[in-house]
Design a protein with these regions (language model features):
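Phosphate-end processing signature that detects enzymes handling 5′-triphosphorylated RNA
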Residues: 1-266
């Protein structure tokens, strides 16, 4: 563990804990706006210390960092990615997400609304369905699209990529904000081969609020000269896994925050 990593761990350990049931009751935020930042780990440690009075950290069985694995689904021609890249007002992403090595797993869909807010819907599924584009996933996505967009699925989904990372979750004491801090983020293709990762020493911080904006934590980030970035894990994953698609809108973020497989080996 580096000195920087140790500083971040110590800052996380100094925060007051919150249990999962209390966090979900206080700030479910399934309809929200997200603001994202790429933050050096040293700055993240300062951030956690600066937010100790206003935020608590999720703790489960004594742990404060948790492994996540999300598999994203799209059509063969990446229609969902293209809708995102073209900035369509109504666009969505489908995935399954597994928490750690245990059985907890969900089907999830994130739907962008016309006014910019994002709605996240999810339902529990068996862990063996993680990464599988079966009929249960198609039915869940179809129902969600009909409820919120008035139209069904209309395309065949297949697994396109997987993203793994270690996450720390904070919640504000007033329940207005939820903040996630992701590190050790790796992108894998459908065969499980690594295609890229978040640069070592960086964290992807997301501030989630009902109305958008940086929140109190964003103000602390601005005080360190850090500004929001426009990215999605799926968009970055496609750019790293399918470079033939092109990702001109993500070029700056990719260069500053991520490295491909060739660069990792160098």
């Amino acid at each position: 563990m580096t000195t920087v990593d140790l500083g971040l761990t110590e800052a996380r350990d100094r925060m007051e804990p919150i249990a999962l049931p209390e966090l979900e009751a206080r700030a479910p935020l399934l309809e929200r706006r997200d603001t994202k930042y790429l933050v050096p780990a040293a700055a993240a440690a300062v951030l956690l210390d600066g937010g100790r009075a206003d935020y608590q950290v999720l703790q489960i069985d004594g742990a404060r960092v948790f492994g996540y694995e999300s598999t994203y689904f799209d059509s063969a021609d990446l229609a969902l990615y293209r809708a995102h890249a073209q900035g369509r007002r109504l666009r969505w992403k489908a995935r399954t997400r597994r928490y750690g090595a245990g059985p907890l797993c969900f089907r999830e869909i994130k739907l962008k609304q016309a006014r910019g807010a994002t709605i996240k819907l999810r339902e529990r599924c068996p862990s063996y369905e993680h990464g599988w584009a079966g009929p249960e996933l198609a039915d869940f996505v179809d129902r969600s699209l009909r409820e919120h967009y008035g139209q069904g699925l209309g395309l065949r989904l297949t697994a396109r990529l997987t993203v793994r990372y270690a996450r720390t979750t904070l919640v504000s004491v007033d329940g207005v904000e939820r903040v996630t801090l992701d590190q050790e983020l790796d992108v894998l293709d459908p065969a499980g081969r690594a295609t890229g990762r978040l640069r070592p020493g960086l964290a992807l911080v997301e501030v989630k609020t009902p109305r958008g904006g940086p929140g109190r934590l964003g103000a602390l980030l601005a005080g360190q000269g850090l500004r929001p970035v426009s990215l999605s894990k799926y968009g970055v994953g496609v750019a790293l896994t399918h470079p033939e698609v092109g990702a001109s809108g993500l070029r700056r973020v990719l260069q500053s925050g991520f490295c491909g497989l060739d660069e990792r080996a160098a």
